[in-house]
Amino acid sequence: MEIQKFIDHTILKPEATEEQVKKLCKEARDYKFASVCVNPYYTSLVSKELQGTDVKTCVVIGFPLGANTKEVKAFETKQAIENGAKEVDMVINIGALKDKKYDVVKEDIEAVVNEAKGKALVKVIIETCLLTDEEKVKACEISKEVGADFVKTSTGFSTGGAKKEDVKLMRETVGENIGVKASGGIRDYKTSLEMIEAGANRIGASAGIKIVEESK
């Protein structure tokens, strides 16, 4: 298995410097990862660094709380795409989901999906550690309904990360036609493999190199 093709090589910590981001891009080029995932500020830099390679620029939207308005998320998406993003990882409105305001959740995801249509893949972060199983299923169903390309477990900034049980539930909910991304706390090959076996076809991790080296 070419594990590197599953990996979104990620640096989302607020103190990330330009030098660190450039280093990450070089690693992604060398290891042929799926993408480099960064905060919006670094979109242009990453796009420039990855030019002429198959590694995609992936940018987070409404991150990490998901509590921005849909208009702001749509604008963030538009700007990210203009600056070279080929994938966007958005955080849902978690409070609205808890309140069973499913129309709000739907419109929120839809705002990003509509902005990205035909230009970038959309991954929807549902933040599994804050949800009941019922809420996880609902978030996945809504994401699928509005045309998201992936559902994703976690931001890595909340109370917990990816669990294989959640990945399995998400995969069962969305079926085979959309992606499932496991992220948050995945630091070795063994865990990555467990996530893939549970149904993930993308892994978000800052430990991508370690994961690949362990797979050899």
Swiss-Prot record:
Reaction equations catalysed: 2-deoxy-D-ribose 5-phosphate = D-glyceraldehyde 3-phosphate + acetaldehyde
Record has RNA-binding as a keyword: no
Catalytic residue list: 89, 152, 181
One GO MF term attached to the UniProt entry: deoxyribose-phosphate aldolase activity
Coiled-coil annotated residue ranges, if any: none
Intracellular or extracellular location(s): Cytoplasm
SMART domains named in the record: DeoC (SM01133)
Location, primary (coarse class): cytoplasm
E.C. designation(s): 4.1.2.4
Assigned keywords, A-Z: Cytoplasm, Lyase, Schiff base
Metabolic or biological pathway: Carbohydrate degradation; 2-deoxy-D-ribose 1-phosphate degradation; D-glyceraldehyde 3-phosphate and acetaldehyde from 2-deoxy-alpha-D-ribose 1-phosphate: step 2/2
Pfam families: DeoC
Annotated SUPFAM superfamilies: Aldolase
One BP term from GO: deoxyribonucleotide catabolic process
Keyword field contains Acetylation: no
UniProt cross-references to InterPro entries, sorted A to Z: Aldolase_TIM, DeoC, DeoC/FbaB/LacD_aldolase, DeoC_typeI
Cellular-component GO terms for this entry: cytoplasm
Function: Catalyzes a reversible aldol reaction between acetaldehyde and D-glyceraldehyde 3-phosphate to generate 2-deoxy-D-ribose 5-phosphate.
Family: Belongs to the DeoC/FbaB aldolase family. DeoC type 1 subfamily.
Protein name per Swiss-Prot or TrEMBL: Deoxyribose-phosphate aldolase
